[in-house]
C-alpha cells in the first residue's frame, strides 16, 4: 500500500512494512519452503514488522490447506515461523479470532507475533501484537476499500 499511496500523491503515509504469506502448506516442509520463498523475494530488504504466516480459508473454500486439522495447521505455522527466524527475520501468525481459537493451538504460538483479524468490535478479543479491525475503510485519494490495522508493537 505504501507505494500505491505515494503514487496517488498522498505523501509517505505508510512507513512501516511487513509481509504475509497466504499459506497453502499442508506439511512442515512446505511451510519452510514458503518461508524461504518470502525471504528470497525480499532479496535482503529489511522489514519493520514480521513476516506473517497467513492462515485462513481460500476464497473458494477448496484450497490445499483448508482441510488441515489443528495439529497439522499449528505444525505448519511453527515450521514457517522457525524458518523465518532462522533466516534473520521476525516471524508471526495472522488469522481471525475464530481460526486462532478453533484451528490453531495458541499455546504453541507464544514465541511469535500475533496479528488478529476481528471486525466490528472495539478491540481484539484475544491478546495480539497487531489487530485488523476492518477491511472496508476508505482514505481520500484512493478509490477502493482498505484494511485498517492497529499495531501494538511500538
Residue ranges and their predicted role:
Residues 27-43, 58-79, 83:
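Alpha-helical scaffold elements lining the catalytic groove of polysaccharide deacetylases
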Residues 16-22, 49-55, 90-94, 113-116, ...:
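Structural recognition of the beta-strand scaffold that forms the well-ordered cores
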Residues 84, 88-101:
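Aromatic-lined carbohydrate-recognition surfaces of secreted/lumenal glycan-active proteins
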